[in-house]
Regions:
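Extended beta-strand-rich architecture
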Residues: 3-175
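N-terminal low-complexity segments that are often proline-rich with Ser/Thr-Pro
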Residues: 177-179
Length: 179
């Protein structure tokens, strides 16, 4: 955790319950785990990854004037196996946006890029688990030219990428209707 904070990341904690719409957008086609008695439609399924909470926090902060964001979350996700047995997995996820540094009176700094995100992920991995390769990613909500699966020692340990412009537009439109 301290390594992420030393890179300027702020930790968030989001609900493990998300909307079906968020699951359909970010759930990577995984089976939903419906809540028997949800508090609201926005909390009707258990999350299968942490992306929804990060993106919703990002949009909230963006609407309140925060362009430059570095967020991370460590949280539990929930899955069902073919036998309908439920299991829980702890994951870590992060998000960066805006400029590399805050602008000052003298100069404007460059926007963060895919490579800044890749560097942040690489810094988080231990020396024994450095990224061994990146392979093209086919996750629907990510931009196809700016996304990759992360492999450490031939094991897929995650993904990184930029949100697809169509997904981002959909999120902004949905968020505007909700507020």
């Amino acid at each position: 955790m301290y390594k992420r904070q030393s890179q300027g990341f702020n930790e968030i904690v989001s609900y493990a319950f998300i909307s079906k719409e968020d699951h359909n957008l970010f759930g990577q086609k995984q089976k939903t785990l419906d809540v028997a008695n949800p508090l609201s439609q926005n909390m009707s399924v258990m999350r299968t990854n942490l992306v929804s909470g990060l993106v919703n926090t990002f949009l909230y902060n963006l609407n309140h004037g925060q362009q430059n964001q570095r967020l991370f979350e460590i949280g539990n996700t929930f899955f069902t196996k073919k036998s309908n047995e439920v299991f829980e997995q702890k994951l870590v996820a992060g998000l960066i946006s805006g400029r590399k540094q805050s602008d000052n009176w003298k100069e404007k700094y460059a926007e963060v890029t895919f490579y800044d995100l890749k560097g942040a992920v690489q810094d988080l991995l231990t020396d024994s688990n450095k990224i061994s390769s990146l392979q093209n990613c086919d996750i629907d909500f990510l931009h196809p030219g700016m996304s990759s699966y992360i492999f450490c020692k031939k094991e897929n340990v995650g993904f990184l990428g930029s949100i697809h412009p169509v997904s981002y537009t959909h999120l902004r439109a949905h968020e505007t209707k909700a507020n």
